[in-house]
Amino acid sequence: MKLTCVVIVAVLFLTACQLITAETYSRGEQKHRALSSTDKNSKLTRTCNTPTQYCTLHRHCCSLYCHKTIHACA
């Protein structure tokens, strides 16, 4: 009888642990999805320099090419 009670308590404890872990994981996953969506939106709305505008890096230009010598977008 005591062994049966111990086994039942152990099963209930392990089930509760799994449910808590699953709930925490799903919440974290949802937060991650929200951040991912925000990141995608920021990439879609980024501004870039048009040709002949000043640049220092390729990513500043809409064409993704910056002339190193004249520091202008292609």
UniProtKB/Swiss-Prot annotation:
Disulfide bonds: C48-C62, C55-C66, C61-C73
Residues cleaved off as propeptide: 23-46
Pfam families linked: Conotoxin (PF02950)
Function: Omega-conotoxins act at presynaptic membranes, they bind and block voltage-gated calcium channels (Cav).
Any one Gene Ontology molecular-function term assigned to this protein's record: ion channel inhibitor activity
InterPro entries in alphabetical order: Conotoxin, Conotoxin_omega-typ_CS
Cell compartments where the protein resides: Secreted
Keyword Iron-sulfur applies: no
The entry's keywords: Calcium channel impairing toxin, Disulfide bond, Ion channel impairing toxin, Knottin, Neurotoxin, Presynaptic neurotoxin, Secreted, Signal, Toxin, Voltage-gated calcium channel impairing toxin
Protein family: Belongs to the conotoxin O1 superfamily.
Tissue specificity: Expressed by the venom duct.
Protein name (database record): Omega-conotoxin-like PuIIA
